[in-house]
From Swiss-Prot:
PANTHER family in the record: 40S RIBOSOMAL PROTEIN S15A (PTHR11758)
The entry's keywords: Ribonucleoprotein, Ribosomal protein, RNA-binding, rRNA-binding
GO annotation, biological process: translation
Entry protein name: Small ribosomal subunit protein uS8
Task performed by this protein: One of the primary rRNA binding proteins, it binds directly to 16S rRNA central domain where it helps coordinate assembly of the platform of the 30S subunit.
Molecular function GO terms recorded: rRNA binding; structural constituent of ribosome
Higher taxonomy: Bacteria, Bacillati, Cyanobacteriota, Cyanophyceae, Oscillatoriophycideae
Amino acid sequence: MAANDTISDMLTRIRNACMVQHDNTKVPMTRMTRNIAEVLKDEGFIENYTEAGEGIEKHLVISLKYKGRNRQPIIQKLQRVSKPGLRVYSNHKDLPRVLGGIGIAIISTSKGVMTDRQARKEGIGGEILCYVW
């Protein structure tokens, strides 16, 4: 099934896999989904990701992270902000703080995909893709 919004598709697959405590999930690969997975890995929300498949069948295998004996998912919530029908942009001064800095906002900027903290530090704004906490 082809998804028009690959970012929402990726976030939904991760959210569903966390709810049923799967160790990993498969996501169709684009440059944007790879960059988002890299940010999630750097921020400690996922264990790792690997690229698999070839050509049109290329996908990411994302290893999810859990804590404690009853395997509580590290990712409590994934929320899509900017959608194909309603894009949300912000300059570096107005970038939101997610849960007072506990969570992150993933921003697509002219210098690539990064967290809200990195964008504020570099003084650049961009499209707010999603919130993660």
